[in-house]
């Protein structure tokens, strides 16, 4: 006959204990505080059980009693139970205080570990902050739709009247595709001589000139 396979971890042992002693151990719901000396009772009851060693049984019991669920159950005045669920001695204040201190310390360690893990992953927060709304494009600094609209409503530049066609008048002259600011320096029959803001002097026809807008 083959030997039964031994348990390999505390989880398997705790599941086994909850099935074998359901009035004492559990894996869900509220835990029950265990009788002092429960390990000796377990060692006697499981003496013929080949699947669990005493070493693994001891570590599994320590794992069970250090769980938050179990520590919550250790309150002053509550009764401990034996393997059959029978009441044993009540929990003393000293033991209850110790359990609460263990619980708070354990929770603090978990919170600190979680905080360290979050701090080690700044990429997640950074990528979240750097997301842009795909439906809209940001406007250049200092401009927005309200600033752009008035420019589209401006009337076209005026042609020069005979009175304005004199030296000293500020104009714009169309050279290439873009109008350039200039000042009339001389008017003759064959054209108008203007000086660009760049300092260049050119002669153009009157039709290429427009009255410069007054600066506000």
Curated annotation (Swiss-Prot):
<dbReference type="Pfam" id="PF17516">
    <property type="entry name" value="ProQ_C"/>
</dbReference>
<dbReference type="InterPro" id="IPR023529">
    <property type="entry name" value="ProQ"/>
</dbReference>
<keyword id="KW-0694">RNA-binding</keyword>
<comment type="similarity">
    <text>Belongs to the ProQ family.</text>
</comment>
<protein>
    <recommendedName>
        <fullName>RNA chaperone ProQ</fullName>
    </recommendedName>
</protein>
<keyword id="KW-0143">Chaperone</keyword>
<dbReference type="InterPro" id="IPR036442">
    <property type="entry name" value="ProQ/FinO_sf"/>
</dbReference>
<dbReference type="InterPro" id="IPR035236">
    <property type="entry name" value="ProQ_C"/>
</dbReference>
<dbReference type="GO" id="GO:0010608">
    <property type="term" value="P:post-transcriptional regulation of gene expression"/>
</dbReference>
<dbReference type="GO" id="GO:0005829">
    <property type="term" value="C:cytosol"/>
</dbReference>
<dbReference type="InterPro" id="IPR016103">
    <property type="entry name" value="ProQ/FinO"/>
</dbReference>
<dbReference type="GO" id="GO:0033592">
    <property type="term" value="F:RNA strand annealing activity"/>
</dbReference>
<keyword id="KW-0963">Cytoplasm</keyword>
<comment type="function">
    <text>RNA chaperone with significant RNA binding, RNA strand exchange and RNA duplexing activities.</text>
</comment>
<dbReference type="Pfam" id="PF04352">
    <property type="entry name" value="ProQ"/>
</dbReference>
<feature type="compositionally biased region" description="Basic and acidic residues">
    <location>
        <begin position="105"/>
        <end position="115"/>
    </location>
</feature>
<feature type="region of interest" description="Disordered">
    <location>
        <begin position="105"/>
        <end position="159"/>
    </location>
</feature>
<dbReference type="GO" id="GO:0034057">
    <property type="term" value="F:RNA strand-exchange activity"/>
</dbReference>
């Amino acid at each position: 006959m083959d030997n039964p396979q031994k348990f390999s971890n505390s989880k398997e042992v705790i599941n086994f204990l909850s099935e074998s002693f359901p009035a004492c151990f559990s894996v869900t719901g509220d835990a029950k505080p265990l009788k002092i000396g429960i390990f000796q009772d377990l060692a006697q009851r499981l003496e013929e059980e080949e699947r669990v060693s005493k070493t693994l049984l001891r570590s599994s019991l320590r794992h069970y009693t250090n769980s938050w669920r179990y520590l919550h159950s250790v309150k002053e005045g509550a009764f401990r139970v034996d393997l059959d669920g029978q009441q044993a001695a009540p929990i003393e204040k000293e033991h209850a205080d110790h359990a609460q201190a263990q619980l708070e310390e354990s929770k603090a360690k978990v919170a600190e570990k979680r905080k360290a893990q979050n701090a080690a992953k700044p990429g997640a927060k950074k990528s979240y902050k750097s997301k842009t709304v795909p439906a809209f494009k940001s406007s250049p600094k200092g401009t927005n739709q309200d600033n752009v609209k008035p420019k589209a409503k401006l009337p076209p530049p005026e042609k020069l009247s005979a009175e304005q066609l004199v030296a000293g008048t500020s104009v714009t002259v169309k050279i290439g595709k873009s109008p350039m600011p200039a000042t009339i320096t001389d008017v003759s029959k064959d054209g108008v001589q203007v000086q660009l803001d760049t300092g260049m002097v050119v002669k153009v026809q009157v039709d290429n000139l427009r009255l410069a807008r007054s600066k506000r």
